[in-house]
């Protein structure tokens, strides 16, 4: 998956809550298996690993299906969940993280389909969470004769479905955005509708 580039030194003790935490995607080897994984890293090292649940296209020939649940981790009072790339196509991924209390969904990606930037706005709106999608730019030919072109457009999206920042399609960018996580904890749309309390899971079974 995407190679991780450090934007600065590794986190160290004494750093503020979110300034020295990092999420990156890696190819993880575990025994005889390989997983498309995301790591959450903090001042004391590795916090958590999530293994991609939904493999896309030729990834099925390279990686095993992820066997870790969608979990939420408290980082200095901010609740972080992770999903990877094509996981966005399955609404259950973001909904599970939201139901477990995520304020922010970290979403490292190698997106080649054009739909995700707009779709993630819906994921944020329907779950009232923030989402940070970090995507690649450029091209790569993993399988001979089948080049991949990445769409760029890394973005930060808000619980109201609005784009706080979206990067370009063709150049590397870094941006710092200040958010209020309390907006992700208010699940009320109006005086009468709460998106979680109004759920009818008894009617949703397939």
What spans do the regions from the language model cover?
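Short beta-strand-to-loop element that shapes/binds the nucleotide-sugar donor at the catalytic cleft/hinge
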Residues: 23-28
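Short helix-loop capping/hinge motifs at secondary-structure junctions, enriched
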Residues: 45-48, 162-164, 184-185
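A conserved C-terminal secondary-structure "cap"
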Residues: 183-206
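Short beta-strand-to-turn element immediately C-terminal to the catalytic PLP-Schiff-base lysine
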Residues: 41-42, 157-158, 177-179
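Active-site catalytic loop in hydrolytic enzyme cores
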Residues: 29-100, 109, 115-122, 150, ...
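Short, surface-exposed linear segments at secondary-structure transitions and domain or protein termini
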Residues: 56-62, 173-176, 180-185
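CN hydrolase (nitrilase-like) catalytic-core segments centered on the catalytic cysteine
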Residues: 3-18, 89-175
């Amino acid at each position: 998956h995407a190679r991780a580039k450090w934007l600065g030194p590794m986190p160290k003790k004494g750093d503020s809550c979110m300034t020295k935490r990092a999420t990156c995607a890696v190819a993880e080897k575990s025994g005889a298996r390989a997983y498309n994984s995301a790591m959450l890293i903090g001042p004391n090292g590795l916090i958590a690993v999530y293994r991609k649940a939904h493999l896309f296209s030729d990834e099925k020939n390279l990686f095993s299906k992820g066997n870790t649940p969608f979990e939420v981790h408290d980082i200095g009072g901010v609740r972080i969940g992770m999903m990877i790339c094509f996981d966005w196509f399955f609404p259950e991924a973001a909904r599970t993280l939201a139901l477990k209390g995520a304020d922010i969904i970290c979403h490292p990606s190698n997106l080649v389909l054009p739909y995700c930037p707009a779709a993630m706005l819906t994921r944020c709106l329907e779950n009232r969470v923030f989402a940070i999608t970090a995507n690649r730019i450029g091209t790569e030919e993993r399988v001979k004769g089948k080049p991949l072109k990445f769409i760029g457009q890394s973005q930060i999206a808000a619980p109201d479905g609005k784009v706080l920042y979206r990067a370009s399609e063709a150049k590397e960018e870094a941006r710092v955005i200040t958010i209020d996580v309390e907006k992700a904890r208010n699940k009320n749309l109006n005086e009468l509708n709460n998106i979680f309390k109004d759920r009818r899971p008894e009617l949703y079974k397939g």
